[in-house]
Amino acid sequence: MSSIYLDHNATTALDPRVLESMLPWMQRQSGNPTSRHVFGRSARDAVEHARTQVAEACGAYASQVIFTASGTEANNFAVKGIAGNQAGSQILYSAIEHPCVSRPARAMQQAGWLSDAIGVDAHGVLSTAQLQQQLQKPTSVASVMLANNETGVIQNIAEIAEIVRKAGAFMHTDAVQGLGKVPVSFTDLNVHAMTVSSHKIHGPQGAAALILDKRVDIQPLLHGGGQERGLRSGTENVAAIVGFGAACELAVANVAQFASHTQMLRDTFELGLKALDVTIFSQQSTRLPNTSFFALDGIEGETLVTALDRKGYAVASGSACSSDSTEPSHVLLAMGIKPDLARGAVRVSFGAHNTLLQVTDFLTTLKNEILRLKQLTGVAA
């Protein structure tokens, strides 16, 4: 039995065209991009071409792109690096951020910084009123994600950034889930720093970027050879960076088609969900077109995910980076969802290659598994 992949917010398959762009850098002698000989110059040219591709995909300048090994590294870099020059000030982050933003913010407390979470409403939308109140204290950086990896809710980052700028703080957004699904522009979002990642857009794992306004004074996390303008030391992963650039080019070219196709699949899926007595989260909000997050009262999300996996469908119970946790989704708790219902949450995230037939077949399987689990657990059908 072949499995159907419905977990594209976790990671995506490598596009064959991306792999083709990477192969020369994996199969033949590649120089160190800092070396001055012909092999090094060739590698440097490849990295700089990819830098331009990433910049163009993100509405930025190539000089603003700093390559990292992951979105987690880029987010840590933004939070710790920007705050690092302003000891004693506070770091703000939304209550629904990925742990690679919230945890470094909280970790900075041990070194003398303050950190605080900005609340969201019942639909997962950030409270700008609370943000304005919190900004009355001296603030170094505020980090609010463009699109949530669980609910898919899209924040009005340009509006939030304007509020943050007026308070004299720096604004960072984690745009990892947005790139390739919706138009993303560093300039239009009006932020000082933005994170994007390769493996969410059919590029290779091991490549990401922090896009940074060059006027921002940031402290490097890694010290060594001084690569990436002295801001991120370490020999560049040429093959992965080349793949990232190619993936960016393809993602931007296909973003409208992706959005139209996956929203059709998502809307069809959620129409079918209504007959299954489930709670669909954030339906009232502007969301990523491919994402549906729902829950069943009385059935653990992990239990349903495992049951569906056995039937050939790969879905998630929340963020892939914390899917081994038995705790309810911190995103749903921040939205005021009761813990018992939050524990029943399941995320489905569609991709460009999923089909309508797969959706209808999945709905049938989902209905059967829900009925079976309700009978086993004694939950009223």
Please place each PLM-identified region on the residue numbering:
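Pyridoxal 5′-phosphate
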Residues: 1-381
